């Protein structure tokens, strides 16, 4: 794998991206020369969450990229159509789709409301299907087509079903759809998944998964961003149908010092593994 990938001139369409891992991936790709279009809901600041589409766009442009923030809900079909149309109109095509947007509720069957179940399915699984499907005609015309989904490897350990099957089903659905693209378009479109080895310091981890203590046992989103940039530099002939782990990607690329990615208070020995690993 190349340790310094060039995405120069390529156009990325991403779901989410106003904060966290998605924003970090967008900024990193912008530094590598990519155009970034992203669909997110946060138009005005929310005191509970950092970042808006506008602050994310400013960071992309500060990194040297061109940004197209699209305000909308990934669950809405019109938003998907509008996002694809505006991206193609602005940048001339779509080379890469990054399925980043995700909802999480860690509750089991009998504990989770149908409303929350539908939310996870609609954003995670359906959103991945909808955005990828809508962009597919443009990917097939690209010189470097790639679908990258932030979802885990399919772990047969039944622990994840026992603890929170609804979320597990939605994330594994994202993975299976991506592997489906890889098989259906094996020689034409690269389609891969990427997942962190450890907890990543995001608002979701702090507010839902692990609290402040978990943040002190996490890595920064930049580790996922650097790994994503490397994977996105690969062609279908080099890698497709893979479920990559961030630190494995970096190690294979010759990046051995991962301490640079430690979040405040974290050490190399107290990192907590992410879900599904």
Question: Predicted regions span which residues?
Answer:
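C-terminal helical subdomain
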Residues: 193-194, 212-277
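A short, exposed helix-loop element centered on a Lys and neighboring polar residues
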Residues: 132-133, 179
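Substrate-binding pocket helix/loop in short-chain dehydrogenase/reductase
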Residues: 108-109, 116-118
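Catalytic loop of short-chain dehydrogenase/reductase
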Residues: 140-186, 197-200
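Conserved Rossmann-fold SDR core element
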Residues: 29, 93-95, 175-178, 184-196, ...
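Active-site loop of short-chain dehydrogenase/reductase
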Residues: 10, 65-66, 93-94, 139-153, ...
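Canonical Rossmann dinucleotide-binding motif of NAD(H)/NADP(H)-dependent dehydrogenases/reductases
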Residues: 4-41
């Amino acid at each position: 794998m190349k340790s310094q990938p060039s995405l120069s001139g390529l156009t990325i369409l991403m779901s989410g991206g106003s904060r966290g891992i998605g924003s970090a991936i967008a900024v990193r790709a912008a530094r590598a020369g990519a155009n970034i279009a992203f669909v997110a809901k946060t138009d005005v600041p929310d005191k509970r969450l950092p970042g808006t589409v506008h602050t994310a766009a400013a960071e992309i442009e500060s990194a040297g990229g061109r940004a197209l923030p699209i305000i909308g809900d990934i669950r809405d079909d019109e938003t998907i159509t509008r996002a694809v149309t505006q991206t193609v109109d602005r940048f001339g095509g779509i080379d890469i789709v990054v399925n980043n947007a995700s909802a999480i509720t860690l509750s089991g069957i009998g504990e989770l409301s149908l409303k929350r179940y539908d939310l996870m399915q609609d954003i995670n699984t359906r959103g991945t299907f909808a955005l990828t499907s809508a962009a597919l005609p443009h990917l097939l015309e690209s010189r470097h087509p790639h679908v990258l989904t932030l979802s885990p490897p399919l772990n047969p350990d039944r622990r994840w079903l026992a603890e929170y099957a609804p979320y597990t089903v939605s994330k594994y659905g994202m993975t299976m759809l991506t592997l489906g693209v890889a098989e259906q378009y094996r020689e034409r479109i690269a389609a891969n998944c990427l997942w962190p080895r450890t907890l990543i310091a995001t608002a979701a981890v702090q507010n839902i998964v692990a609290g402040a203590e978990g943040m002190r046992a996490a890595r920064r989103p930049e580790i996922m961003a650097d790994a994503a940039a490397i994977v996105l530099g690969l062609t279908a002939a080099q890698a497709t149908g893979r479920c990559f782990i961030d630190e494995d990607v970096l190690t294979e690329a010759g990046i051995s010092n991962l301490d640079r990615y430690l979040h405040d208070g974290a050490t190399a020995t107290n990192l907590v593994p992410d879900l599904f690993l």
